[in-house]
A protein has these predicted regions:
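Conserved HGGG/HGGXW glycine-rich cap/lid loop of the alpha/beta-hydrolase fold
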Residues: 2-44
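The conserved beta1-alpha1 loop
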Residues: 7-11, 74, 189
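Active-site loop/oxyanion-hole signature of alpha/beta-hydrolase fold enzymes
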Residues: 24, 33-72, 233
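Gly/Ala-rich beta-loop-alpha elbow adjacent to hydrolase catalytic centers
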Residues: 73, 77, 81
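Flexible "cap/lid" loop of the alpha/beta hydrolase fold
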Residues: 86, 92-123
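Conserved alpha/beta-hydrolase catalytic His-Asp/Glu region
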Residues: 126-180
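Conserved serine/cysteine hydrolase catalytic core
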Residues: 166-206, 215
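Catalytic histidine-centered segment of alpha/beta-hydrolase-like enzymes
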Residues: 216-232
Length: 256
């Protein structure tokens, strides 16, 4: 098997920095590419005005790589990956959705809380504030060691698109996503994830009928920061498996 090109798509917040500990933990046959999307990590949002614009920026990164390619979407990164593949599912050989954000946006309490723009700004400032860091260390990043926890939280201050994501990702958007019947996929979740409930997996199975599921004991929401060695082992193994599944006879993807 050729080297698997693993494109890791970050969630809302600080951009690709959440994957900074991962390259050293991946085997030689899996190469990590972690682009920072427009509006995150200090990258200007520019004229991007929706999830489709983020997906277009991601597409440029993906098509520049040789095959086989696997997308790994974490949080809203999963939504951006789904948006991209909704029109071009053959761009990649597999998809890993790790605790994706996208479903139940009209019923979950956090997206509803952040409907007012002033609340979004207050939350963004609060997450990045050093004053509230002890609180977040007991909740959001409770398993992430120093100094990575502080770096991750501080990066929210530079997320120009943070608030806009709550306008762009809606229940209507999610309901309009097509089923991807031939795409090899894995839905990955941490057993101790306190940010997103694993019961949401069923909503993604509807979109990805070829998906399998994996729940990892001991993982919270950010295992790429809290335990990069274990995370690297798991995502590398999953990526290899998806590439093998994509090349199986009769899948319609073996010539991709």
């Amino acid at each position: 098997m050729s080297t698997v090109q693993l494109v890791a798509v970050h969630g809302n917040g600080g951009g690709a920095a959440r994957f900074a500990r991962l390259p050293a933990e991946l085997p030689h046959d899996v190469a990590l590419h972690a682009p920072t999307l427009p509006g995150f990590g200090g990258r200007p949002l520019g004229d991007v005005d929706g999830v489709a614009g983020l997906a277009a920026a991601l597409r440029e990164e993906v098509v520049a790589l040789p095959r086989p390619r696997v997308l790994l979407g974490h949080g809203i990164g999963g939504s951006v990956a789904l948006e991209l593949l909704s029109s071009e599912p053959d761009l990649v050989d597999g998809l890993v959705l790790h605790a994706p954000v996208g479903t139940r946006l009209d019923t979950r309490w956090f997206p509803r809380l952040l409907r007012p723009r002033w609340v979004r700004r207050a939350v963004q400032v609060g997450i990045s504030s050093p004053v509230l860091r002890p609180l977040w260390r007991r909740t959001i990043v409770r398993d992430v060691p120093a100094p990575f926890d502080a770096q991750f939280l501080a990066a929210y201050a530079d997320a120009e698109a943070f608030g806009a994501m709550f306008d762009w990702l809606t229940a209507t958007w999610f309901d309009g996503l097509p089923v991807l019947p031939d795409l090899p996929a894995t839905i990955l979740w941490g057993e101790d994830d306190r940010v997103l409930g694993a019961d949401q997996r069923a909503d993604y199975r509807r979109l990805l009928p070829r998906a399998d599921e994996r729940t990892v004991p001991g993982w919270g929401h950010f295992p790429m920061l809290s335990d990069p060695h274990a995370y690297g082992e798991v995502v590398a193994g999953v990526a290899r498996t998806l590439v093998r599944r994509a090349s199986e006879p009769g899948t319609g993807r073996e010539a991709s």
